[in-house]
Amino acid sequence: MTTVAVKPATMAQALTRAMRDAMAADPTVHVMGEDVGTLGGVFRVTDGLAKEFGEDRCTDTPLAEAGILGAAVGMAMYGLRPVVEMQFDAFAYPAFEQLVSHVSRMRNRTRGRMPLPITVRIPYGGGIGGVEHHSDSSEAYYMATPGLHVVTPATVADAYGLLRQAIASDDPVVFLEPKRLYWSKDSWNPEQPTDVEPIGRAVVRRTGRSATLITYGPSLPVCMEAAEAAQAEGWDLEVVDLRSLVPFDDETVCASIRRTGRAVVVHESTGFGGPGGEIAARVTERCFHHLEAPVLRVAGFDIPYPPPMLERHHLPGVDRILDAVARLQWEAEG
C-alpha cells in the first residue's frame, strides 16, 4: 500500500494549486485581474499560472475593477468560468454596480436560464498593517446581496477545497481570502486535496460544553487560542467555523448551541451592521429555548480600519473573547 506524504503547505500555495488544477481540468476556466499574470498577484497567489497556461487564460487587466467584473459577466454569459481577483478588499468597491446589478441578478433575471459561474476572489481583513483601502472587512455587504454565495476559508485544506467548489459552481461566489492567513501553514495531503465539507456546511473545529464560539476566516485561529486559554478558567469552549456565510449552516450551529446553551460570535467586521447581528438573530430565532444567556458579539470597533500601529487593538483578541465568555457565565447565573 502506497503512503501519501502529508507535508506543510501555506494557504497561498493551496489556493494557487486549486486554480492550477481547475484550469488543467477545464479549459473554460480563466483567471483575470490586476497583476495576476506576469507578477503572479500582489500576494503571489497566481504565481506561475500565466507561464503554464498562457496569458490568454491568466490575464493582466487595467486598474479598473468595474471593467474587470463587467468583462467577467460577458465571459460567463459566453460560456466561460472567469476567476476574478480584486487586488485588495476595498478595491472591490468600484465594481459593486456590476456585482449587485448584474452578477447577483442574472440567474433570476433570466428565470434560471443563464447562470453566471463567476468566482470573485477578494483578499480581506486585517493583520498585515495595511494602509487605508488595503485592510477592510466587507463581508456584510455581500451577505446582504441576494444571489451571491459568500465563502471564506480558514484552513489550508479548505482554501483548496472550497475554491475548487466555487470555481465549479454555476452560482456566482464571492471568495474571501483572509490576508493574514495566506502564509499560515498546515499539514495538507496534495493527493487528496478535495476531501472537505461542501460550501454551505460549517465545521466544529473544537468540541466543548461551556459555550460556543461561532466564527469564520481570520478569526478562527484567535478563537482556537482563546478556547485553549479558557481551560485555565475551567471553561470548555466549542468552536464552530462557518466557512460559508451564504449559504448559512443553521443545522450545525444550532446543534452546537443545544450542547452548550451559550454563544459568542467573533469576527473582524464591525459590530453594528456586521455579520454577527444576523448570526445572533438566526441563533435566537431557531435555538431560543436552548439558550441560557443572550448571544454576544466580539467584533471590530465601529470605525474604519485604524492605522497599522493601532490595528492590533481593533481586531478581536483572546482577552476580549474571554471577557465575553465570562459575561456569558455571569448572565447564565443570573
Segments predicted by a language model, with ranges:
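Thiamine diphosphate
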Residues: 1-176, 181, 313, 330, ...
